[in-house]
């Protein structure tokens, strides 16, 4: 007989675990999510080509990132409009933040720069001798919509992202700004 599990059973199971086990599950779930994203992309690419796969990926990320931002904000008890500080807090809670080393630079009330120090996708391609994956259009949709969901005043600019040239110690970098005339006093 196959056991049945309710959502409550699963929640109770998670509460029974110690902190280290929970952290391992969170990291492993993030890896599984990214593996699914990559396999999905490869399936679309195999059937429809790279350009179509990138466009489908861009559209999917544009939508997913809004869902992700809203859920993070709800979990943190945030409302839209919290500025750069709210964005930086939300970025720490993204699935990607559990997998890719990142750095925040030049943080102020009106500006921050996020640098992706390592990227599991790009590093895997490099290990396989493949060229950088040209993810700039996807990243721009992803980061712009995430930031705009956190605070509609935030504007996003890509500093560098493949296929752009980038320093060896980073894969991509994104600038988030709130125009000075829209900053709260």
What are these regions (language model features)?
Residues 1-113, 120-138, 148-173, 179-185:
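N-terminal accessory segment detector
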């Amino acid at each position: 007989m196959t056991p049945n599990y309710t959502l409550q059973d699963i929640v109770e199971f998670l509460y029974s675990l110690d902190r280290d086990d929970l952290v391992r599950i969170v990291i492993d779930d993030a890896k599984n999510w990214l593996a699914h994203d990559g396999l999905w992309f490869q399936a679309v690419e195999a059937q429809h080509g790279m350009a179509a796969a990138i466009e489908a990926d861009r559209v999917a990320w544009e939508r997913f990132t809004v869902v992700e931002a809203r859920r993070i904000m709800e979990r943190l008890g945030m409302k839209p409009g919290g500025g750069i500080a709210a964005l930086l807090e939300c970025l720490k809670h993204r699935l990607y933040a559990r997998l890719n080393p990142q750095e925040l630079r030049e943080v102020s009330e009106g500006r921050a720069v996020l640098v992706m120090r390592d990227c599991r996708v790009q590093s895997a391609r490099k290990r396989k001798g493949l060229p950088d994956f040209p993810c700039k259009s996807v990243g721009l949709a992803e980061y712009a919509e995430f930031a705009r969901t956190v605070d509609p005043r935030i504007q996003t600019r890509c500093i560098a992202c493949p296929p752009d040239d980038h320093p060896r110690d980073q894969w991509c970098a994104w600038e988030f700004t709130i125009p000075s005339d829209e900053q709260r006093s």
